[in-house]
Amino acid sequence: MGKFPEAEERLLNVKICMRCNARNAVRATTCRKCGYQNLRPKNKERKA
């Protein structure tokens, strides 16, 4: 997706909220938008 490794790391190294799909920091424990605690790591590989 990114053109170089630094961009790839910046785009994919996040957590996604399971309720509102917001992007959060990797170290986040709760969602920045809705406060939900169930966060998942962003998928590194696209589903085909």
UniProtKB/Swiss-Prot annotation:
PANTHER family: 50S RIBOSOMAL PROTEIN L40E, LARGE RIBOSOMAL SUBUNIT PROTEIN EL40. SUPFAM superfamilies: Zn-binding ribosomal proteins. Signal peptide: none annotated. The keyword Ribosomal protein applies. GO terms for cellular component: ribonucleoprotein complex; ribosome. This is Large ribosomal subunit protein eL40. Belongs to the eukaryotic ribosomal protein eL40 family. It comes from Methanosphaerula palustris (strain ATCC BAA-1556 / DSM 19958 / E1-9c). One of its GO terms (biological process) is translation. Gene3D superfamilies: 4.10.1060.50.
